[in-house]
């Protein structure tokens, strides 16, 4: 059977950067280590005045199409995942297609276009849609373009303000992929939750503590569901495990939970028994509260063991580098975690061919999804072609006052004019509104 997966990836980061420990923390009167050690964040990307989810998505897509030598005729489907949409009817994918048609011969007249919404998991759901479309044989030999693009902003003064970010990930989904093959097996954990939502509002309403609990619960359920179809997981089976990363500190909690689950009744638990005992079993406790207290105690000890620290450093830590420098990209965050891991492998000279990733996606509301990906022989060429470091180094640093101006510019409730901080070059830019209040864009050489 023909393999289907991610043939190529590209990113586009917001062109401005805010230094969290040195610029944001002092104004907020916070200890810088709250951000660097607690949240695991150092800098956040923000969009310039002329940037938004359309320009970032279109620019990432153009980089991908140019590198792969594609034209609109090669693309049969454009799916955009976002939770930053500005129109309740017209999908962002049509805007992005319109941008791309300005610079390529031909058009996307016969490409299916849509927009996915389920908080941050929508990017992975769009991958699933593209995968199923190709597997069903409905693609007519064409590839799918999946774009995850978001401007993740919180109300000023909100506790989540430090976890903001902006950027886009473009992925080409095709047969015989050059980067990773997606597994047929998937696992889900889904419940009706109100942990993070935006009911007719731009900025989220968040129950932070509840959101973390729901994230972990749904991830556990998704992993159990995945194992029901793919068989038991084990830490040694996966070279990297990219998680949805709203901030790296959240992944520390998810990784510990995952490691405990995967090592239960394994050689690793046997090896750890003399040091921290065996994992608590529910049947050994009279009440659920007693069982949970025992689990918490076990996990507190587990995270101090050499086995866990070594595994975390090898398998999890490399997935967090890009996120620590750009912040939360919502629908794109798990996909930059994948990119971060593979980039680390390339930098280390590691041969990833045939190795597996276990990818954990999450969206508030709430749903988690687990699937595996097998790295392809041509992965290194694809990863080395993505200019992550150059893009991040080229960002323009802003002051706290500048940050507040940019926040106001991208606040849908405010109308202010601010001079751009950077000069656009060879990219799509927002130019204003049309007669029906649609957003207008053009390509600047």
From Swiss-Prot:
Superkingdom of this protein's organism? Archaea
Q: Where does (3S)-3-hydroxy-3-methylglutaryl-CoA bind?
A: 31, 120, 163, 211, 244, 253, 328, 364
Keywords (alphabetical) are:
Acyltransferase, Isoprene biosynthesis, Lipid biosynthesis, Lipid metabolism, Transferase
How its function is modulated: the record gives:
In contrast to bacterial and eukaryotic HMG-CoA synthases, is insensitive to feedback substrate inhibition by acetoacetyl-CoA. Enzymatic activity is inhibited by hymeglusin, which also blocks the propagation of H.volcanii cells in vivo, indicating the critical role that the mevalonate pathway plays in isoprenoid biosynthesis by these archaea.
Specify whether rRNA-binding is a keyword of the entry: no
- What Pfam families is this protein classified in? HMG_CoA_synt_C, HMG_CoA_synt_N
What does the record give as EC number? 2.3.3.10
Q: Which residues form the active site?
A: 83 (proton donor/acceptor), 120 (acyl-thioester intermediate), 244 (proton donor/acceptor)
GO annotation, biological process: acetyl-CoA metabolic process; farnesyl diphosphate biosynthetic process, mevalonate pathway
**A GO term, aspect molecular function:** hydroxymethylglutaryl-CoA synthase activity
Give a short account of what the protein does. Answer: Catalyzes the condensation of acetyl-CoA with acetoacetyl-CoA to form 3-hydroxy-3-methylglutaryl-CoA (HMG-CoA). Functions in the mevalonate (MVA) pathway leading to isopentenyl diphosphate (IPP), a key precursor for the biosynthesis of isoprenoid compounds such as archaeal membrane lipids.
Q: Which PANTHER family match?
A: 3-HYDROXY-3-METHYLGLUTARYL COENZYME A SYNTHASE, HYDROXYMETHYLGLUTARYL-COA SYNTHASE
The protein's name in its UniProt record: Hydroxymethylglutaryl-CoA synthase
Question: Taxonomic lineage per UniProt?
Answer: Archaea, Methanobacteriati, Methanobacteriota, Stenosarchaea group, Halobacteria
Query: Which gene is the coding source of this polypeptide chain?
Result: hmgB
């Amino acid at each position: 059977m023909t393999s289907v997966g991610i043939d190529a990836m590209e990113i586009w980061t917001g062109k401005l950067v805010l230094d969290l420990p040195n610029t944001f923390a002092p104004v907020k009167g916070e200890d810088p280590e709250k951000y660097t050690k607690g949240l695991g964040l150092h800098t956040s990307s923000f969009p310039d005045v002329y940037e938004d989810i359309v320009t970032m998505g279109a620019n990432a897509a153009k980089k991908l199409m140019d590198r792969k030598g594609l034209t609109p005729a090669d693309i049969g489907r454009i799916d955009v995942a976002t939770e930053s949409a500005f129109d309740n009817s017209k999908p962002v994918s049509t805007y992005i297609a319109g941008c791309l048609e300005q610079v390529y011969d031909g058009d996307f007249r016969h490409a299916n276009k849509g927009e996915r919404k389920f908080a941050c998991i929508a990017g992975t759901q769009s991958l699933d849609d593209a995968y199923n479309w190709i597997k069903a044989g409905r693609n007519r030999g064409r590839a799918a373009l999946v774009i995850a693009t978001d401007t993740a902003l919180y109300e000023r003064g909100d506790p989540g303000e430090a976890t903001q970010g902006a950027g886009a990930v473009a992925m080409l989904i095709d047969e015989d992929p050059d980067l990773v093959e997606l597994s047929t097996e998937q696992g889900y954990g889904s419940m009706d939750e109100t942990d993070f939502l935006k009911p007719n509002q731009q900025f989220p309403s968040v129950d932070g503590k509840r959101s973390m609990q729901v994230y972990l619960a749904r991830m556990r359920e998704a992993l159990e569901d995945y194992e029901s179809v793919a068989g038991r997981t084990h830490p040694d089976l996966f070279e990297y495990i990219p998680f949805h990363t709203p901030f790296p500190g959240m992944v520390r909690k998810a990784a510990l939970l995952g490691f405990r689950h995967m090592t239960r009744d394994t050689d690793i638990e046997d090896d750890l028994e003399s040091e921290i005992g065996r994992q608590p079993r529910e049947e050994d406790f009279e009440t659920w509260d007693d069982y949970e207290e025992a689990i918490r105690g076990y996990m507190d000890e587990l995270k101090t063991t050499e086995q866990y620290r070594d595994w975390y450093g090898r398998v999890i830590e490399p997935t967090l580098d890009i996120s620590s420098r750009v912040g939360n990209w919502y629908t794109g965050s798990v996909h930059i975690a994948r990119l971060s891991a593979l980039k680390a492998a390339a930098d280390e000279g590691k041969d990833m061919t045939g190795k597996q990733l276990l990818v954990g996606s999450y969206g508030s509301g709430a749903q988690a999804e687990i699937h595996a990906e097998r790295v392809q022989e041509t992965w290194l060429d694809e990863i080395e072609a993505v200019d992550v470091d150059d893009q991040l180094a080229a960002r323009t640093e802003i002051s706290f006052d500048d940050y507040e101006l940019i926040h106001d510019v991208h606040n849908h409730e405010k109308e202010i004019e601010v001079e751009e901080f950077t000069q656009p070059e060879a990219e799509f830019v927002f130019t204003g509104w049309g007669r029906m209040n649609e957003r207008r864009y053009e390509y600047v050489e």
